[in-house]
Curated annotation (Swiss-Prot):
Pfam family, one: Abhydrolase_1
Lineage, opening ranks: Bacteria, Pseudomonadati, Pseudomonadota, Betaproteobacteria, Rhodocyclales
Keyword Cytoplasm attached: yes
Catalytic activity line of the entry: L-homoserine + succinyl-CoA = O-succinyl-L-homoserine + CoA
Organism: Dechloromonas aromatica (strain RCB)
Family: Belongs to the AB hydrolase superfamily. MetX family.
Keywords: Acyltransferase, Amino-acid biosynthesis, Cytoplasm, Methionine biosynthesis, Transferase
Job of this protein: Transfers a succinyl group from succinyl-CoA to L-homoserine, forming succinyl-L-homoserine.
Gene responsible for this protein: metXS
InterPro entries tied to this protein: AB_hydrolase_1, AB_hydrolase_fold, HAT_MetX-like
GO cellular component: cytoplasm
Active site: 153 (nucleophile), 318, 351
The protein's name: Homoserine O-succinyltransferase
Length: 374
């Protein structure tokens, strides 16, 4: 279902003066959120869908910028007229979360108390903090309840958190390629990535902005590690195998295999535009996410607070958040008599499958959204 792109779009900025008290104990006295919208909010304001981004995502979900036609939104293939998130029917909202590096208040923003970039002094943010900030944006837009809150990976965790924190404001939650909490292995991956950044000599305790430098080497390594976990072994084998860039071994430590070249390219590209402090914050938000902790680890008790209908989707080759993790959420919801649709989709792209255009996958989302009553 190719549909159409939403075309040229423009980001918007919302400023909030009301202090936001964070789970970490920190306080943001004021903050900005950058966001984009697609489609038209109906008179009843009942057709709004919030799209939450994953670790490296942002507000630019769909379309392109007039002066940057190649800057396509990260989920453009699913948003637009005739696509699952049909902008002829729905009003789509995407934003850059607090702590981000794409315009919303984050570590690279000026700390009003010092007049310098926040850097490492920016308070740790949790998924629930994002949800509260997003709720204030909904208030600003006049949206009392979302037709749906959705996202993949860390975005799916935000959708899950919305359904628990503001059950009366979410009619449907679409949780894709997510988990109710991170496994020890996932926490370990995140810690290694953070150590790559923290031990970079150019990190300067998180205040590298003042030194006119960036911990590029550490961020590059962190992204290379993360990227491996986003792909499936089968996909990497099919795409790269053991192919060499040249016809013979060089017997050195330079790039020889095509997979090495790919990972270094991805690391360099990411380190060129992303902020290391934001990467640290996002990975900690992932580590801390565990709504069931409020109920002594009982996810069924936690999900009893929800009221929404749910679509839970997982991918067969996602070894970072396996289908078994999604089924934990499904089981907890069914134990509470919730209306749950579950899809286990056979795609070969590993964790990144949620970003891909696939007829079956998009058909599942489209069929679910078609049944939403506005």
């Amino acid at each position: 279902m190719p549909g159409q792109s939403v075309g040229a779009v423009q980001p918007q900025r919302a400023h909030f003066d009301q202090p936001l008290h964070l789970r970490s104990g920190g306080v943001l006295p004021a903050y900005d959120l950058v966001y984009e919208t697609y489609g038209t909010l109906n008179a009843a304001k009942s057709n709004a869908i919030l799209v939450c981004h994953a670790l490296s995502g942002h507000h630019h979900v769909a379309g392109h910028y007039a002066d940057q036609p190649d800057n396509i939104g990260w989920w453009d293939n699913i948003v637009g007229p005739g696509r699952p998130l049909d902008t002829d029917k729905f009003f789509i909202v995407g934003l850059n979360n607090l702590g981000g590096c794409h315009g919303s208040t984050g570590p690279s923003s000026l700390n009003p108390a010092t007049g310098k970039p926040w850097g490492a002094d920016f308070p740790i943010v949790a998924v629930n903090d994002w949800v509260h900030a997003q709720a204030r944006l909904a208030d600003l837009l006049g949206i009392d309840s979302w037709a749906a809150v959705m996202g993949g990976s860390l975005g799916g965790m935000q959708a899950l958190r919305w359904s628990i924190t503001f059950p009366e404001r979410v009619r449907n939650a679409i949780v894709i390629a997510a988990a109710p909490k991170l496994s020890a292995q996932n926490i370990a991956f995140n810690d290694v990535a953070r150590q790559a950044i923290l031990t970079d000599p150019d990190f300067h305790g998180g205040h590298y902005y003042e030194h006119n430098t960036r911990p590029v080497r550490g961020l590059r390594l962190a992204r290379m590690l993360g990227h491996i976990t986003y792909l499936s072994d089968d996909q990497m084998g099919e795409k790269f195998g053991r192919e060499l860039r040249n016809s013979a071994f060089s017997f050195g430590y330079g790039v020889e295999f095509e997979v090495e070249s790919y990972l270094r390219y991805q690391g360099d590209k990411f380190a060129g535009y992303f902020d290391a402090n934001t990467y640290l914050l996002m990975t900690k938000a992932l580590d801390y996410f565990d709504p069931s902790r409020e109920d002594d680890g009982n996810l069924t008790a936690t999900m009893a607070r929800t009221q929404a209908n749910f679509l839970i989707a997982s991918f067969t080759t996602d070894w970072r958040f396996t289908p078994a993790r999604s089924k934990e959420i499904v089981a907890a919801l069914l134990a509470n008599g919730r209306n749950v649709s579950y899809a286990e989709i056979d795609l070969n792209f590993g964790h990144d499958s949620f970003l891909m255009e696939d007829a079956h996958y998009h058909g599942v989302v489209d069929a679910y959204l078609r049944n939403i009553k506005l």
